[in-house]
Design a protein with these regions (language model features):
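PLP-dependent class I/II
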Residues: 1-215
């Protein structure tokens, strides 16, 4: 499971995550929790599976909240019985992360105020999309609770999200992602917007979409 999620920005509530963890424990299922977008939330903080189950596998990264995309650095929290097997597996892929990446990661823990300011910027851009996208005909979506994506139902506009996104790119220069990249069954009716770029770029993109939809 992923919380906050990509592409929806949905955050799994603590009681729901606890129920999932209990179900997995009862059924002998290994729970893997992708928590890469932890720290980027707009309401309550996202719960971690590590607090709910000693048997869960938690995957996280410095790429999102810590803005270290490209440094290829992350971590796992695993049950004791998996430590040795995972270490053996990892040693077949790499020896260790670069020292430079590790030193940078240590330094970034002292940058919380700046990082939280970046999250506040995401919130501002999210709120702009929530206000302005309906003016461009994108009015069927749930407000993202975390991450920096908005997943919109465009079934009122198209039944082919790939062709729809290609047309928008060709005619407006705005790049959005077709839902089929995330959901092969229902993705033709959805698109994903990202608001990880600057406020000026997001605002300009929305203006183009509004103008594009005008009769």
């Amino acid at each position: 499971m992923t919380s906050p999620g990509n592409p929806s920005g949905t955050v799994i509530a603590p009681h729901e995550m606890a129920a999932l963890a209990a179900y997995c424990r009862d059924k002998g299922i290994r729970l893997i929790s992708d928590e890469i977008y932890h720290g980027i939330t707009y309401e309550a903080a996202a719960a971690t599976a590590a607090a709910l189950s000693d048997e869960a596998i938690v995957i996280n990264s410095f790429s999102k909240y810590f803005t270290m995309t490209g440094w290829r650095l992350g971590w796992m929290v695993v049950p004791e019985d998996l430590v040795a097997p995972i270490c053996r597996l990892i040693q077949n892929f790499y020896i260790s992360p670069p020292t430079l990446s590790q030193d940078a990661a240590l330094a970034v823990f002292d940058c919380r105020a700046e990082l939280d300011g970046i999250v506040a910027g995401y919130r501002e851009r999210r709120d702009l999309l929530l206000r302005e996208l309906p003016k461009a005909g994108f009015n069927k979506f749930a407000a993202p609770q975390g991450a920096f994506y908005l997943y919109a139902d465009v079934s009122n506009l198209t039944n082919d999200s790939v062709a729809f996104c290609e047309r928008i790119l060709d005619e407006t220069g705005v790049a959005i992602v077709p839902g089929v990249d995330f959901d092969r069954e229902r993705g033709q009716a959805y698109v994903r917007f990202s608001f990880s770029t600057s406020l000026e770029v997001v605002a300009g993109a929305v203006r183009r979409l509004i103008d594009w939809q005008k009769p």
